[in-house]
């Protein structure tokens, strides 16, 4: 695939303005029924090293098909600013996606979708930029609060609510007794559909298998730079 050029803001204030504008383009409607090939995205970075981004092409029936890795030099990275992570990681993700042998039908991203202070986490940002359905699966809570306590058993889910009560996604227990995940739609996916899709994915550990494999690849690639 050939992603369109990604704008690089000159400073955080410009990034904030762009983020607010792009958030208005997010569509929280759509189905992932019938989607078969997705790209799972994960990134890893250590001070003094390039940022490593991995795009793993995954067939929901056959498993992993292809892994593409991109390195972005540290000096080329957008400054680290909480809530603006997508401007730091997205250029490397787009480079990795461009190296895949075929375009995915949807994106599964390690990070937030609309569960973000301005409604545009990395999954939403990439989804809008590429006009692809996208789902964010985060390991940590960035924004919002659980509607109720989350049961310990596998498959349990409670809604994640914004401070004003709007639903943002779900707090989801992928395995009994493990820490929860925070699932939110990115773009062209409804809230319930995002959770439904993540529940469909094979999950042997805490992370859905496509994201777990992408995470392992990113870690290996970063370690190889030492």
From Swiss-Prot:
Its EC number is 3.1.21.7. Keywords: Cytoplasm, DNA damage, DNA repair, Endonuclease, Hydrolase, Magnesium, Metal-binding, Nuclease. The record marks 80 as: Interaction with target DNA. InterPro entries: Endonuclease-V. It is found in: Cytoplasm. One of its GO terms (cellular component) is cytoplasm. It holds the Pfam family Endonuclease_5. Mg(2+) binds at residues 42, 110. DNA repair enzyme involved in the repair of deaminated bases. Selectively cleaves double-stranded DNA at the second phosphodiester bond 3' to a deoxyinosine leaving behind the intact lesion on the nicked DNA. This is Endonuclease V. It comes from Thermus thermophilus (strain ATCC 27634 / DSM 579 / HB8).
